[in-house]
Amino acid sequence: MGSIGWAQLLIIAVIVVLLFGTNKLRTLGSDLGASIKGFKKAMGDDSQTPPTNVDKTSNDADFAKSITEKQQPVAKAEESKSHEKEQG
């Protein structure tokens, strides 16, 4: 008594076609298909993104290393200036 049979589904389908018309249902179906296709494409693009981020991370690490190497000579120069002030 709680389940819907094939006869009830057929009656519901006929009522929907009569209410909306075949053109409206065709447009609705194509819009739904395009939405699903766009969603799948977006999910596929998302899975391809992480490998490019890994490359950027390795470049960032090299960049940080070069910055620390450049800052070390500046720190040594400041130490020598402060050492000269203490002696002088």
Swiss-Prot record:
Lipid bilayer topology: Single-pass membrane protein
GO cellular component terms, semicolon-separated: TAT protein transport complex
UniProt cross-references to InterPro entries, sorted A to Z: TatA/B/E, TatA/E
Keyword Cell inner membrane: yes
Single GO molecular function: protein transmembrane transporter activity
Keywords: Cell inner membrane, Cell membrane, Membrane, Protein transport, Translocation, Transmembrane, Transmembrane helix, Transport
Chain ranges passing through the membrane: 1-21
Biased composition (Basic and acidic residues): 76-88
One annotated GO biological process: protein transport by the Tat complex
Disordered: annotated span: 41-88
Presence of the UniProt keyword Transport in the record: yes
Biased composition (Polar residues): 46-56
Cellular location(s): Cell inner membrane
Function (record text): Part of the twin-arginine translocation (Tat) system that transports large folded proteins containing a characteristic twin-arginine motif in their signal peptide across membranes. TatA could form the protein-conducting channel of the Tat system.
Subunit annotation: The Tat system comprises two distinct complexes: a TatABC complex, containing multiple copies of TatA, TatB and TatC subunits, and a separate TatA complex, containing only TatA subunits. Substrates initially bind to the TatABC complex, which probably triggers association of the separate TatA complex to form the active translocon.
Family: Belongs to the TatA/E family.
Protein name: Sec-independent protein translocase protein TatA
Gene: tatA
